[in-house]
Amino acid sequence: MSNHTCLITGAGGLVGSSLAEACVKGGYKVKALIRSGSDGSFLEKLGVEVVRGDLQDKNLPKEATEGVDTVFHCAAKVGDWGTVDSYRQVNVEGLRKLLDSFNPAQLYKFVHFSSLGVYEARHHHQTDESTPPPDQHFDGYTQSKMESEKLALQYHKEKGYPIVVLRPGFIYGPRDRTVLPRLMEKLKTKEVKYIGSSSYAMNNIFVGNLVQAAFLALDNPNAVGQVFNLTDGEKVSKKRFITTIAKGMNLPTPFFLPVPLWLVKFIANSMEKKALKRGALEAPKITKANIKFLGLNLDFSIEKAKRILGYAPAKTFDEGMAETLNWYKNKS
């Protein structure tokens, strides 16, 4: 039985809800911060204290931070469309507000969830944490995630906050109600095409493996002030990733579209400019941001997490995806 009291921000999402479930099993007292109007039924069934609030509010609810010594900061504005400032307001200024709600002396750990997306939008072959992310990105989400990482580490260096930064790749798992459902919808309508090479690696991580890494970071004093890349630890091609979903859900398998990457980038740039000009609220079908998912080799090293945290992914890609697809089948 743990004597820690955890605050999980973004607890209504895939990562946050999975952490809440694991924390309850581990005997932690849990406070789950979710936005007003969000469905908190899963969290309530777990028996956690559900607190409603928003990182964009002027002040966070007092009950969210009172008595808390451990924070899992999962909340973020996600997507590939919108102004940089709209993302900064949540992902950077929201983080600042959250950090300022605590005295660093009261904190055991503050685990900040970043993203492998902060690295440069290029092909990656075992890129590790010694490669610094660029200061400028072409989409608001990635730009704000890079800035929030820097802010978290600044609070560690200058104010002594016990920060750990985790950089997960593409997260999949049960209770994902956004990314995989959209991908499945596109598979149904045969909108998914491979760009570049279908053999390019994904940077995927099963949510259970990410939760495992988060708890390893929580209990390791050597993790403080560090950044960790996190994936499933095996090379999974985009073809294998998408085909596994298609076959598992009895959906059409996409075909290879031999379009050079430079042409797709040109089309994406053109579509974005037109969408911005007409003030579109929704992203065009192809954006520069989602080219990373479709057209780049995303292979990152997790040797640092293995060495310092003792991270050894508990589930393989096949096991994690089978669990994920079973959840979708039982839900529908």
What do these predicted regions represent?
Residues 37-44, 48-93, 101, 116:
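NAD(P)H-binding glycine-rich loop region in Rossmannoid oxidoreductase-like domains
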Residues 132-135, 165, 185-205, 209, ...:
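A conserved pocket-lining segment of Rossmann-fold NAD(P)-dependent short-chain dehydrogenase/reductase
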Residues 97-140:
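Conserved Rossmann-fold NAD(P)-dependent oxidoreductase catalytic core, especially the SDR/UDP-sugar
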Residues 123-171, 192-195:
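Catalytic helix-loop patch of NAD(P)-dependent Rossmann-fold dehydrogenases
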Residues 146, 159-161, 172-182, 208, ...:
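Glycine/proline-rich active-site loop of Rossmann-fold NAD(P)-dependent oxidoreductases
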Residues 5, 300-308, 312-332:
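Amphipathic terminal alpha-helices
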Residues 6-26:
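N-terminal Rossmann NAD(P)H-binding glycine-rich loop of SDR-like oxidoreductase domains
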Residues 220-284, 322-325:
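Mid/C-terminal beta-alpha module of Rossmann-like enzyme folds, strongest
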